[in-house]
Amino acid sequence: MSRLPLSLRMLARAIAALASVATAAGCVVVNAGAAGTPPNLFFDDFSYAAPGELAAGGWQLRDGVGHPGLPGGRFSAGAITLLDDPLQPGNRVLRMTAHTDGTGPGTVQAQLCHQRKYLRGTYAARIRFSDAPRSGVDGDPIIESFYAVAPLAHPFDPDFSELDWEYLPNGGWGSDKTRLYGVSWQTVQIDPWESHNSAHEEFASFDGWHTLLMQVTKGEVHEFVDGRPVAVHDGRNVPVAPMTISFNLWFAVGGTLPAGGAPRVYDEDIDWVFHARDQVLSPADVDAQVRALRADHVTRTDTVPAANPPLQPRCDI
């Protein structure tokens, strides 16, 4: 019989003894301060030696052409690397890199996705956004994201589901303003474009490390940035189908700098990603659980059951 490490057992006992637990909107709501590890948990802090090990952790690295991004551009598995964290000795981070010279053939983007089995509960990730390219001239409409998505079977598919965090340091989509989008989708048609969603925008620079969190119940999506509540989405904009947890880094159509010259190279780093199935956890709860997992040297765990019947993960919608 397997046993939790000591610190996690102590946290679990604290929940049983001290936490007030209620059932609401189809999820278990764990009050602030109740930081025990949930039974259905996915956590990955990307402590892999090389990208080839990501598949064993359930990740798929996108390789090929397709939506989104510049026409003619491609997604490359080689655009995903793992490196030592210069700010935390012993820690590793996953890095997505995208570059463009303003042409489709000169554009490479990055994307990875996990298994398609996530719906209600709490999603969180710690991400480093970048306002400027690592090299090259600044100004291209780069999109830096963390999201969960179910495939679009056809235009305006009623079962389409998507939750997005998208950072636009150089603007894009008709505006030059730096902003962070928090979006919960109802449905969409790709071509010609027509979308139905509920969106929140934070007009500020988010350069550097940030923790993004989403609480999903049957009736609402609550969004938090660095522990601060920023938006609530409800009604038909709440996810209805199991989704993949995904990250991507890509260039929006329209607004790229003139073609030619040295490639403009952008990075997005990911420290960890977390999902607690069917549990609404506060930002403080998630931070406490991540600290406990790391204290017990748990670099990856996945006890979230597969969808029934199993669903094929896809890195494109």
Segments (PLM) and residue ranges:
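Bacterial N-terminal signal peptides that target proteins for export
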Residues: 2-15
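Bacterial N-terminal signal peptides
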Residues: 14-26
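Low-complexity, Ser/Thr/Pro/Gly-rich disordered linker/stalk regions
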Residues: 27-140, 144-151, 271-317
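Short tryptophan-centered beta-strand motifs in secreted/extracellular beta-sheet-rich domains
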Residues: 46, 123-125, 208-216, 221-223
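Aromatic sugar-binding interfaces of carbohydrate-active proteins
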Residues: 58, 156, 204, 220-317
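Structural recognition of the beta-strand scaffold that forms the well-ordered cores
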Residues: 95, 164-166, 246-248
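Short edge-strand/loop segments of extracellular domains
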Residues: 142-159, 168-170, 228-229, 237
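Glycine-aromatic-enriched beta-strand/loop faces of beta-sandwich-type recognition domains
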Residues: 154-208, 255
